[in-house]
């Protein structure tokens, strides 16, 4: 595509918005990971079994997934500023209260509430990037904010462990929840849609708009202009192209949730690696994924600047990343810890490289239904978060981890094929 050239220098106000999204993603994922950090101490204090702890872990994923579509609908009605303020404030309060939980049921309830309020997060990110960035910069923007999830997991988990050891597990939730509450107030004070933002130049607005950015797409819909959803709207949301993207997101999320849930157990129980060594080995794949997601956005936008079509530039990193992720099953054929770590790091690098899937949602979704489409997209990812812990657990219990890794590889392959066979040309639906 042609990159617009303006006589006036466009300015860089949009990058402040991108940094704000990145910080929010870091907070979002730290508030997901804090329970894993504190789980052993919680089990000991409350006498919770591993099976019961499984219910606590899954409470987030179930409600997070179920609220994706309602969250997207709400986003389309009120816009990003209000949606994200309510979401960040809500999940942060629920996180803080987890530090005062009194037992199993209160933990389950509070984790479920956390999932409800986190549901609109990534549809909101997608809507903002669509409004703030031209097409040829969008993949890099998505890659940058998506990397926040790996920063939170790879770099901040040791800090949470230190807080727990210095104080108690309660403070893991109090600190992370308190930071989120403060950030929600900063967000509401600072963020505005592009046209309402102070300090943004007309040249930058023109640059974004001329490059395909929807500079008016992040404003809340006026009450009198709101339209009820119709059967035609739902048909557009489940267009063949978008179904291909949804399947791809299920595949990307499936690999991610294997690493979030079963990877440490795989190392210690299946491969007999010591807990200390496994702790180091779990960090390496997250760092590899962090590199992968940053590199994918850069590669996608570079291809656009080199004259390749938008569809080719966006789909190539996703397809390649999903195919690379299939190498995870190679760990079935070695017991060497270094080789296992390399294969797992390569697979998770591929997962990170494929994680710019959101950039295609912003290019394919019907303009009036970006939030709803993002909700369905994230719903598909949430299904991966629900099914992988269950399927891998069942396979590992009955047959060992080898068929579980084959399952993860097969899902990644299906995801790659969905982009090749279903998505086709990247053109906005409707």
Curated annotation (Swiss-Prot):
It catalyses: D-galactonate(in) + H(+)(in) = D-galactonate(out) + H(+)(out). CDD domains: MFS_ExuT_GudP_like. GO terms for cellular component: plasma membrane. It is found in: Cell inner membrane. It comes from the Bacteria. Major conformational changes and local movement around the substrate site occur to accommodate substrate for transport. Active transport requires reversible protonation of both Asp-31 and Glu-118. The exact stoichiometry of cotransport is not determined and could be greater than 1. NCBIfam families: 2A0104 (TIGR00881), 2A0114 (TIGR00893). Disulfide bonds: none annotated. InterPro entries: MFS, MFS_dom, MFS_Na/Anion_cotransporter, MFS_trans_sf. The chain crosses the membrane at residues 18-39, 51-74, 82-100, 104-125, 142-164, 169-190, 242-267, 277-297, 315-333, 337-354, 374-395, 401-423. This is D-galactonate transporter. Induction: Part of the dgoRKADT operon, which encodes proteins for the metabolism of D-galactonate. Negatively regulated by DgoR. Expression is induced in the presence of D-galactonate. Residues 1-17, 75-81, 126-141, 191-241, 298-314, 355-373, 424-430 are cytoplasmic. Pfam families: MFS_1. Disruption phenotype: Deletion mutant cannot grow on D-galactonate. Belongs to the major facilitator superfamily. Phthalate permease family. GO terms for molecular function: D-galactonate transmembrane transporter activity; solute:proton symporter activity.
């Amino acid at each position: 595509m042609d990159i617009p050239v303006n006589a006036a220098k466009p300015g860089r106000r949009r990058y402040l918005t991108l940094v704000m999204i990145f910080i929010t993603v870091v907070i979002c994922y730290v508030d997901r990971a804090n329970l894993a950090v504190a789980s052993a101490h919680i089990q000991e204090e409350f006498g919770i079994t591993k099976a019961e702890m499984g219910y606590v872990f899954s409470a987030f994923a179930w409600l997070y997934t179920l609220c994706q579509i309602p969250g997207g609908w709400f986003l389309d009605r009120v816009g990003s500023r209000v949606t994200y303020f309510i979401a960040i404030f809500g999940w942060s309060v629920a996180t803080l209260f987890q530090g005062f939980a009194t037992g199993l049921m209160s933990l389950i309830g509070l984790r479920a509430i956390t999932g409800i309020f986190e549901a609109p997060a990534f549809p909101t990110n997608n809507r903002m990037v669509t409004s703030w960035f031209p097409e040829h910069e969008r993949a890099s923007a998505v890659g940058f904010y998506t990397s926040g999830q790996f920063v939170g997991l790879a770099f901040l988990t040791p800090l949470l462990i230190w807080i727990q050891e210095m104080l108690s597990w309660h403070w893991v939730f109090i600190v992370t929840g308190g930071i989120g509450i403060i950030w929600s107030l900063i967000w509401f004070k600072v963020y505005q849609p592009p046209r309402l933002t102070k300090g943004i130049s007309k040249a930058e607005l023109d640059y974004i708009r001329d490059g395909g950015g929807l500079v008016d797409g992040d404003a809340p819909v006026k009450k009198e202009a709101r339209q009820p959803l119709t059967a035609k709207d739902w048909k557009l949301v489940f267009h063949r192209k978008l179904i291909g993207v949804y399947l791809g997101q299920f595949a990307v999320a499936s690999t991610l949730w294997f690493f979030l849930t079963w990877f440490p157990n795989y190392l210690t129980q299946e491969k007999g690696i010591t807990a200390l060594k496994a702790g180091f080995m779990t960090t390496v794949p997250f760092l590899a994924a962090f590199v992968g997601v940053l590199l994918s956005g850069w590669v996608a936008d570079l291809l656009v600047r080199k004259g390749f079509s938008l569809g080719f530039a966006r789909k190539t990193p996703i397809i390649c990343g999903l195919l690379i992720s299939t190498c995870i099953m190679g760990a079935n054929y070695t017991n060497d810890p270094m080789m296992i770590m390399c294969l797992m790091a390569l697979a998770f690098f591929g997962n990170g490289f494929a994680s710019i899937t959101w950039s295609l949602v912003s290019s394919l979704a019907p303009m009036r239904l970006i939030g709803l489409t993002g909700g369905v997209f994230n719903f598909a990812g949430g299904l991966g978060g629900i099914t992988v812990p269950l399927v891998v657990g069942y396979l590992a219990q009955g047959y060992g981890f080898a068929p579980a890794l084959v399952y993860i590889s097969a899902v990644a392959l299906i995801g790659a094929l969905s982009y090749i066979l279903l998505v086709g040309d990247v053109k906005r639906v409707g």
